[in-house]
Amino acid sequence: MSATPTPTLRPSTVADLETHVAHRVAMFQDMEMGTEEGRKRMAESFRHQLRSWLVTGQCRGLVLEENGRSVASVLLLLKETLPTPVTPLSVRGYLFNVYTVPSHRRRRLAARLTDSALDLARELGIEIVELHASLEAEGLYQRMGFVPTSEMRLVMSAGIKTPKQWKHRR
């Protein structure tokens, strides 16, 4: 009986763009958020935005590979924000697109990626990292030290239906 291989961690490059796009689409599909058409439109817009962020270094990514296949990935956006009394720094980390393919779930790969992304944030001097957790991943992030905040959101377009995942969860 052979042991389960341990996926190899490496930094993302622009060559991983389609992996990150596919993982984002799959993530929202898994959460049953949006329609197939809406996810297609999102993918096109995201592809353009992420390419720009990866090229400029505003976004850093990590990929876990096994046998040459990307099985999990994460992105860390360096987000301009306002200084606060908590920290005078005007850049925060925004962790997003944490995704593991279904065949590799329950192996703590999301935790490994998140830990590695937080290490990267520390190396970059980031003092605060934010994220939006799916219901399924909320417990993982709370165990890692993330806390719910007072963030609120207003949908300004009549054409946008508020997803059930945005409902208050505290």
Regions flagged by a language model, labelled:
Residues L78-T84, E130-H132, E136, Q142, ...:
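Conserved catalytic-core motifs of GNAT/GCN5-like acyltransferases
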Residues H48-V63, Y94:
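A short helix-loop-beta-strand connector motif used in the catalytic cores of GNAT acetyltransferases and
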Residues F28-Q49:
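Conserved GNAT-fold acetyl-CoA-binding loop/helix
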Residues T114, A121-A133:
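Conserved GNAT acetyl-CoA-binding A-motif
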Residues V86-P102:
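Conserved acetyl-CoA binding element of GNAT-fold acetyltransferases
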Residues V63, R69-L78, Y94, Y99:
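Conserved beta-strand in the GNAT
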Residues H104-S116:
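Conserved acetyl-CoA pyrophosphate-binding loop and the N-cap/start of the following alpha-helix
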Residues T8-A22:
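A short beta-loop-alpha structural element at the N-terminal edge
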